[in-house]
């Protein structure tokens, strides 16, 4: 460490590292301060070449084609080129559908033999905190509205809940891509108030949030397909269970973003009470007394699963809180 002038410090980069990453005299490097006080140095940040992947899709179709494109996106590729002697219409339909699921992607070139997908999103514009919070807001509203649709037999609302799951999936994939980019060293943690460890915690929490949305969608789909109707007493019990599950999820997420273990421990305690309530209901209700008892069991099970996934978030929050004290 050397000091020049009144406020400038100079450090030397290790030659072995500079040679390995190809840094030469006159090149620019990116330097970004991290919340823990460290400096993150990235070579050639201003000269980054777009990452490109070429995929032969001749033997890919349907779900396998979709999985291949999503995997390429998550791997951080900026350009995904799909080639085949002839790309049939059904494959192009799958490709367009996948592009809708991936935030920032556009088809920039399309012929009978080639489709080029480009990610136009600047990853420095993404806030993992805001993205995770938005995921939870959507998932929470989906769960709340799915139970409301059951009470009111509002099939339009149930259909809307089903469609909202796509947005949660889109946000989940963005977070996954960003996290992998940071871990692999090809991206920065852009927020000044978040460390790589916190980034990891939010990525971990995004999975149970996505599962909460899945169970809300499951209830909505059941309403649309089975159109179950239950008496007022049964509906009140379902609503009480769902309110408890929603409160547990809200407390868990609040604990995650506040880095406090108190709300998380409270959520875990309330989860135990809800599980007992669900168990008592399942053991006492008579299938012959309700319309479509199978659907009722599925709904109650999904409510319990929402609470279970919320506890997963609470446990992540507790771990993060303890780690932050070191």
Residue ranges and their predicted role:
Residues 1, 6-8, 12-326:
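Cytosolic, long alpha-helical scaffolding segments
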């Amino acid at each position: 460490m050397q000091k020049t002038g009144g406020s400038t410090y100079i450090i030397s980069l290790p030659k072995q590292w500079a040679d390995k990453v190809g840094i030469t005299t006159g090149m620019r490097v990116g330097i970004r301060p991290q919340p823990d006080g460290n400096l993150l140095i990235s070579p050639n940040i201003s000269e980054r070449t777009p990452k490109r992947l070429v995929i032969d899709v001749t033997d890919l179709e349907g779900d396998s084609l979709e999985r291949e494109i999503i995997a390429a996106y998550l791997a951080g590729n900026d350009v995904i080129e799909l080639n085949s002697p002839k790309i049939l219409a059904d494959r192009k339909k799958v490709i367009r559908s996948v592009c809708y699921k991936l935030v920032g992607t556009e088809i920039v070139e399309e012929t009978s033999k080639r489709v080029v997908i480009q990610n136009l999103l600047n990853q420095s514009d993404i806030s993992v905190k805001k993205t995770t919070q938005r995921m939870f807001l959507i998932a929470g509203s989906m769960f709340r509205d799915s139970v409301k649709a059951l009470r009111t037999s509002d099939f339009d609302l149930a259909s809307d809940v089903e469609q909202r799951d796509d947005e949660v999936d889109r946000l989940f994939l963005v977070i996954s891509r960003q996290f992998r980019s940071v871990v692999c060293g090809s991206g920065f943690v852009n927020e000044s108030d978040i460390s790589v460890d916190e980034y990891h915690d939010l990525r971990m929490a995004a999975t149970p949030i996505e599962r909460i949305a899945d169970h809300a969608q499951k209830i909505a789909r059941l309403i649309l397909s089975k159109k179950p109707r239950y008496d007022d007493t049964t509906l009140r019990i379902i609503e009480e269970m769902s309110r408890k599950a929603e409160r547990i999820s809200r407390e868990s997420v609040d604990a995650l973003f506040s880095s406090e273990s108190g709300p998380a421990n409270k959520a875990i305690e309330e989860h135990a009470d809800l599980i007992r309530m669900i168990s008592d209901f399942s053991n006492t209700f008579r299938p012959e007394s309700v319309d479509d008892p199978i659907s009722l069991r599925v709904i109650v099970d999904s409510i319990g699963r929402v609470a279970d996934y919320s506890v997963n978030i609470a446990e992540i929050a507790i771990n993060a809180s303890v780690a932050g004290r070191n």
